Amino acid sequence: MSDCNSGGGERRPNARATDAPPVRAPSGGAFRCRGCGACVILIAKYNPKTDEVTEFNASSCLTLLYSIHFCSIITTEGLGNTKDGFHAIQKRMSGFHASQCGFCTPGMCMSIFSSLVNADKSKKPDPPKGFSKLSVSEAERSFSGNMCRCTGYRPIVDACKSFASDVDLEDLGLNIFWKKGDKHPDPTKLPSYTLGGGICTFPDFLKSEIKSSIDFNDASISSPREGWYCPKNIKQYYKLVNSGLFSESSVKVVVGNTSTGVYKDQDLYDKYIDIAGIPELSAIVRKDKGIEIGAATSISRTIEILNQESESTSSPNGSVVFRKLAEHMSKVASPFVRNTASIGGNIILAHKYPFRSDIATILLGAAATVNLQVSSKTLHVTLEQFLEQPPLGHNTLLLSIFIPHWASDCKKEHTLVFETYRAAPRPLGNAVSYVNSAFLGHVSLDKSSGDNILSNLHLAFGAYGTEHAIRARKVEEYLTGKILSASVVLEAIRLLRETIVPVEGTTHPEYRVSVAVGFLFSFLSPLCKGVIEPGKTLSISEDLVHTDNVHNMPLSSRRETLSGDEYKPVGDPIKKYKVELQASGEAIYVDDIPAPKNCLYGEFIYSTQPLANVKSIKFKPSLASKKILTVVSAKDIPTGGRNIGSTFLFGDEEPLFGDPIAEFAGQALGVVIAETQRYADMAAKQAVVEYTTDGLKAPILTVEQAVQNNSYFQVPPERAPKQVGDFSKGMAEADHKIMSEEVKLASQYYFYMETQTALAIPDEDNTMTVYSSSQFPELAQNVISKCLGIPFNNVRVITRRAGGGFGGKAVRSLHIATAAALCAHTLRRPVRMYLNRNTDMIMVGGRHPMKARYSVGFKSDGKITALHLDLLINAGISADASPVIPGTIISGLKKYNWGALSFDVKLCKTNNTSKSVMRAPGDTQGSFIAEAIIEHVAAILSLDANTVRQKNFHTYDSLVLFYPDSAGESSTYTLHSIFDRLASTSRYLQRVESIKKFNSTNKWRKRGISSVPLIFKVEPRPAPGRVSVLNDGSIVVEVGGVELGQGLWTKVQQMTAFALGQLWPKGCEGLLDRIRVLQSDTLNLIQGGLTAGSTTSESSCAATLQACNMLIERLKPVMERLQLQSDTVSWDTLISQASQENINLSASAYWVPEQDSNFYLNYGAGTSEVEVDLLTGAITIIRSDLIYDCGKSLNPAVDLGQIEGSFIQGIGFFIYEEHQTNSDGLVISNSTWDYKIPSVDTIPKQFNAEVLNTGYHKHRVLSSKASGEPAVVLGASVHCAVREAIRAARIEFAGNNGSGSSLLTFQLDVPAPMTVVKELCGLDIVEKYLEDLSNRGAASGN
């Protein structure tokens, strides 16, 4: 069995599962998606021959348990923990406010630790004390594969950069170690760091065991029934394969097992052959003509070898190939995947599947060959020949890859050129390419003309919609020997278009071909006289670092906050409550709760059809099917219960199971029960559902179909938004009109890091305890009790914390909790359900997609006189919370004074997954629609969009007209001052001019800038609170709200200290440490309500304050009596005396906001500048500036983190995140492979955020304001800036073909990913440019 040092101590796993389960760390790691990095661990391997230890980080969910035999495993708990003390990484992550929900934090810590350990091993000079050898640029890349949905990454970057030897401490963001603005921050105040990480990564006991087992030659490290085989050489491998022990269907050959991150296992395997230990497959052989790399060599190791080879190769011609290959490979996958994925495995995937491999393409461009072992024969074939072969069986091994030097083949008069390209959503990797290519050739000069001639060309293209990478041989043949000119390049591109033909069904086919054309143009243009080279910037904004590539700009930020003193410690930017536990992995989420005895596991079987009768559910014969214990379905609902999976505020319900009709693709049909979660997951994949549509109408999938079928949900009158003014009169006053224009907004998936999960434990007297990752435990209790037919007081729902929510765990979590409870009730055994990422994305829904059609009238100066909006909202199959969405959309729209506003909003019922609330629901879409209209008006009038925006800002009087119940007093209307301040601090006008200059001198890159205002209506909800003082003076606080990462517990802790501090002898010093905030428990504190809308923190604080005030009233008389005896009365003395006097030391309150008077508006604004690559559509966010009115912030550090994270999530919605479904409405962008949230390399290069502390307000909780949701709206500033850049591109390449109006006005829907951006910039701009050059050349006689 494997020995591992997990969590700092010796642990010996005793797994016997025949399917070789992934590593599951005792704590500090989690896995359900195979792509987010939350489960990253450090693996250390010991070589007894060299006495060397190699450390690397890896994704534990991809790492098979038996593959770490004789390895040492370090989780974040092994770095530091409560018992042994926390590591400097954990302390700095905590101190830089770099953890919110905390679910991703263990993986972040381990990625940073791995980078520090490996950097400190380098030959760089020793850094100053307390720092590492890591550089700032390396620090920024150290966690490029780790995803975070909460923070927006900036504080994580700061925490990591704090270790860098070249960091400027003044550039680091808000932290607890020094005050922001200190001219000379003291590095000694940072938690101490020891060079090398300060952790023993490989224990002596394990070294001894390894040394004693060197002569162990058996091919199996475990008993035959465990089925894990490790051949020590190729001969042993073939002996195993030919032994008759294996069948092709049940054996899996593995090296790193990372392929399962892309092509998920469809069944269990009963036998594995691990070939990573075969020396021949990891051998590195340097030859005269090149280098041979063993197929089992990791991609990371391959990069190291290539870099070494590029430095050692004598000829610069030869070194360029290895250097470029290494650079490109560093953008493949993520660091922790590259560490275990083998280069040969990547090529095998490219051979076996239509896998969009970068590595296969670039090696093909470098003319690599491969060595194969077929039984007793060794074959040498070109990579091109290998990729074209039929699939290989286990009797064929890929031995090695040979990459030629090229230097020896290059004549003196020739220059070797080699370039690689990729177009992908993320510049640093962790995203598959839309297109990739690699070009190699020899360049010589024509003696007569001095022009360049190409020879020995290799032009490789891949990922464009082909089975495998290819060489464009017709293009190679055409270009060989020709003098390069614009006309020659143009003809080559025409030939390329004939060659690069995506197969039917390829997404974005025209885009992929266009980008391939752009890559070839980028390669050839520097070799052509008179052709503008895409790769260089000709001028640059004064605001920017001077660089030819904005992708390489260093990340920087300015984070400004003001703290108030009147309510201390409320208002202080203290670190998050118990944040170190999140960093150390000790924070307990639902799946971390130890499985009770006899626990079973469940996974949903879901429909793949949108409207069909379910005739039967059967299972394919397979290993996984044999693991099924039972299937729980609607027939198992007990007498007195009912088929209910969720209920809503407006009386509607959604069934738990589709029975007998599946109403939408993704609807649960039953739950497979097995003894492990992996067994259950795999078994569910074996389900074969038979459907029939007899007697059923066609499904309604689109809003247009809903209109045709009159399929709508009703909006309660009290929730219906109110129109303003007389639309007809306003249109009559207009000088100009835009009639019936359209804009569409797609859905967005929540992508909380912790997927939906619940643990249900049946108890005596027909009771049930359910641990649920939920934003609405109270409603979960309601639905579970109705499903089981038992009273509410028989159901206890507990939520300690959730690993993110964003609205997705409000209503959509109820199905999982209810299903787990039903299974546990039926089987009388505990049942755990933890959805994998694919199932979660398919079943849970997301933000509401919609289509808006608007008509608007306006004056010549940009003043809008009237707006009418027709809005179709796709709500999905059930009402959920959708009836609130029309009101919030219109509320977001009303941020401008439209003069008169009318609308027709239809809430469409369709056969899709139910859409629910998601961060700033409705407001996000409504605000964007407003911006689209403003920008359209500005384009028609050829005015700066900000001029039109400000022209239509509300006066206080119009604000009251549009927001009659929440406008507040005139002194609280701060939008005008915020927008003016933002224009000044962001240098908006100066940058507009700089961008004009940039765009006029750069043909292939364009920039845009835009500002977006924010008005966001907030409606606080009631909340309970209880404060209890124990006899030792310690304090426990209970609130109904759930800690999701938004800092609720932190603010409640601060509020408790502020209130009880009146009786604390030394202000509040030391009081915070005496306060513990407890988990949500529906039988302990009732009426907990919904945690959503960014108001639960303040509502919980209000309830806590009321409860504290009750205690103070009881304790003050005791204090006064004690003060007669002594001037100073300690807290402990006070509590002891009160206890003796039988004073009730527990107080409960239920805070209810006053109707309307507690409603208020949030204000803010954001400015963003972007650069667009016209050849790929890639977007780089150069800079974003935010200013946000937070009232009197309860905790500026928490609020700033919420604002930044919310803004980045907004960027994801508006730009990056493509929510795609098939023709049946089934979600197909259902994994980290297909769905890309923002990552550290796609956030703004410069990110400045300022939190304003504005004045006193009697109706708000200590004058505070919400922070978690509103800033999503400001992400639209990036979308609007992209529109400006596209507009500049369209003007650049218009020629004589387009009118001014068609160039300036165009529909840019949401999201606007690089594929859409490129299409709008032009799919044929390279050809247009070359045609123009060729025509001009012909006219001049050249």
Curated annotation (Swiss-Prot):
Residues 1-23 are annotated as: Disordered. Pfam families: Ald_Xan_dh_C (PF01315), CO_deh_flav_C (PF03450), FAD_binding_5 (PF00941), Fer2_2 (PF01799), MoCoBD_1 (PF02738), MoCoBD_2 (PF20256). One of its GO terms (molecular function) is iron ion binding. It comes from the Eukaryota. Coiled coil: none annotated. PROSITE patterns: FAD_PCMH. InterPro entries: 2Fe-2S-bd, 2Fe-2S-bd_dom_sf, 2Fe-2S_ferredoxin-like_sf, Ald_Oxase/Xan_DH_a/b, Ald_Oxase/Xan_DH_a/b_sf, Ald_Oxase/xanthine_DH-like, AldOxase/xan_DH_MoCoBD1, AldOxase/xan_DH_MoCoBD2. Residues 221-408 form the FAD-binding PCMH-type domain. SUPFAM superfamilies: 2Fe-2S ferredoxin-like, CO dehydrogenase flavoprotein C-terminal domain-like, CO dehydrogenase ISP C-domain like, CO dehydrogenase molybdoprotein N-domain-like, FAD-binding/transporter-associated domain-like, Molybdenum cofactor-binding domain. Belongs to the xanthine dehydrogenase family. This is Putative aldehyde oxidase-like protein.
